[in-house]
Amino acid sequence: MKYQKTVLAAALLAMATTTQAGGLLTNTNQSIAFNRNFARVGAIGIDGVYFNPAGVAFLDQGFHLSLNFQNVYQTREITSTFSVPALANTPYEYPFKLNGGNTTDGSKFYQGKASVPILPSFQVAYNKDKWSFQAGFGLTGGGGKATFNDGLPSFERSVSLLPALINQQLPTFSALLGQNETPATTYSLQSYMSGQQYNFGLQLGVAYKINENLSVFGGARFNYIYNKYQGSITNISANVGGNNQNLYDYFQSKVNALNEKASALQTQAVAAQTQADALRAQANQTTDPTAKAQLLAAADQYAAGAQKATAGAKLVRAGADKLDSSKEKVKDRYLEVSQRGWGITPILGIDYRTGKWNFAARYEFTTKFNIENNTKRDDTKKYENGVNTPNDIPGILALGAQYEVLKNLRVMAGYNHYFDKDARMDNDKQRFLKHNTQEFLAGVEWDINPSVTVSAGGQRTLYGLGDGKYLTDLSFVTSSYSFGFGAKIKVAKNAHLNVAYFFTNYSNFKKEYDGAIEAGQEQVTQPNGTVTMQPKTLATKNTDIFTRTNKVLGVGLDIDF
């Protein structure tokens, strides 16, 4: 079973904003030409520095430059249902109901927003004779900031049980303090997360035109990773005794009251024992049998009272200590951590053209590297400064073809295969994938006249999510369809303006799973007879429905020198 505690640290480390139109960890939208026609691997153009570097060798002699700027907006949406079978037929069976969940099934909707105001990239090539010297730069992963202002299901599940757990303890509080309080009915918390992830990729390489039909490419991309995460879970509260109360302060007030009562009982015990000792001293000094018996009887009563008060003080003090330990679980928590790492991706390419056809392939090797924590604050004690985490970039095999239907009309198709299962991820998460990511791409391009070209394309992305173990509400993707369209407009003799828009329709992925949440401590008798305290857990039934939205608007300029 999945065991859950407070999850702020895991949430922040796992959360990473992505702007991808590609695999699990890859941005392939590296040019505006791509945004209006996704099947670019089989095409020949300056953006081929990324998509079809071997084909760039077939461009005219001289310098070629492409500048690209994109604006990206995403949402991540989760509908979560959560039940506790042990609390069936009570107000706490569907705990999310106590904080705005659906009144029927307790489901609750969560949304995170991510935006990238400007996502830049460029490609440049210098063709001389049969050689093509190339460079490209872009954010090949991440690229923006994601913000979750209202938390996530994994944040809230453990907190949502607090009213039920508090109500279980109210009789104990009443007995120890002599106070009666009405049961807890609702809960609340304030949570904030922001995450930034950047994979800066600088690609260098050389293509060689073997003949007028065949060219090859060899190069590499230097990847520099920078991630930054900040977050907090604060003001965990519940409506207890008719008032919404911060639980850390509430528990502290009970601890103080219990300690005061324990001290008072101990004072009574000392006073009673002192009186008992004094009466025994008097009894030892008297010779009157009747008086001695009366004094000893009174001393025994005081001594018994002292023992009772001492036992009571011990019991109350134990309750205070237990509650003092419990309050640590609801105190405010903060995390601020950044991560850095780097790796080099070797890249090979080939392009072959014959008649009206052009065929191309690109292979990027899996990039092995780690990212290192730079922790400024970690109240969770989960992310030690200097610890390294696997963060491999999956290899890619990209295949493409283009066919010239007419002089002014071209159709394209492509296939991308991401070797996700070969890329090491944190906690070996890649082992939960059923298969590697696959993409199928198609597009069409039409030259309306020598100055205006329009195009459109589609992409089908299939992730190997299996039964959903790979997914969490902290980091998820779902299979999708993307559609893009746009135009290339000649604005000068040697310059073209590219404009494009694309959007992605994500499928809903339903994940059903069992879980367990810590619900305090319980005494457990070991085989050798010793008694130890162990976490007490409650089994849970969980359903998460994941989906996303993605919209990208871009503009770029291609210049030939």
PLM features per residue range, with description:
Residues M1-V7:
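Bacterial N-terminal signal peptides that target proteins for export
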Residues T6, T17-G144, F502:
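N-terminal, post-signal peptide beta-strand-biased segments of exported outer-membrane/organellar beta-barrel
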Residues L8-L13:
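Hydrophobic helical h-region of N-terminal Sec-dependent signal peptides
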Residues A14-A16, F58, W357, L409:
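Charged, amphipathic alpha-helical interaction segments
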Residues A14-T19, P450:
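Short hydrophobic alpha-helical membrane-anchoring segments
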Residues G22-A39, A43-I44, L119, N127-F561:
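Outer-membrane beta-barrel porins/channels
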